[in-house]
Amino acid sequence: MTDIASHRGGALLWPENSRISFENTTKLAVEQVEFDVHPTRDSKLVVIHDDTLDRTTDGKGPVAAQDWAALSKLVLKGTGGQRMLLLDEVIEIFRPTPIVMRLEIKCAPDRVPYPGHAARVARALEQARVLDRCVLTSFQLGTVCEAVAAARPMKHVWLVLPQVQTDIGLANVIASAQGADVPMLGLRQNMLTAEIVAIVRAAGLGIGGWACNDAEAIAKLLALQVDVFTTDRPDLAIAQRAAQTPH
């Protein structure tokens, strides 16, 4: 069965990466929840997608330029006054559930990795005793490798941008993943075909999809039987999977 990951806690249903979205996700029949982790200036780990505060909070400027004391006073838009969450707080929301936490290790502007950030995230999961409940993902292959080196065993996925897939070709993507001992690729849903799924699996790698946010994309990835996909509409994905599953 293809697993469903509630992307940013269901970003088209509730305010993304918020307590509201995560608590609602715990009530859904999903296997995974996806969220994003940035560092603060004082090395706290906060759950927010963008590297700046402007889009999703009432603050402005880079996330990593402020201490947690300042960030904790900001309000997430659409939440009725809730603040952003620390990684440890999100872990505690999902700890009592069977849902796997899928963390994307974010970068600074221009996709420049934060020094030591991936390793800090991995060690935080290890200290919280949830390594076996987590999957680390990144669009930067080196970032994935840094996290895995810091905490083993660690499930991990390389998210491949369409431009990377086009520029270097699928064979080189697979070779790079194999060379880095990365067991799974995540490709954008519009870059996936039955042939590509077969080639990736024949190479001994798992295959997932992302940006599956409408009925057509969800149906496509369910038909391709990928291992997992992320979606901003987990409710829709759950319903479609149930309808397509033989009884």
State where each predicted segment sits.
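Phosphate-group recognition and catalysis centered on beta-loop-alpha active-site segments
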Residues: M1-H247
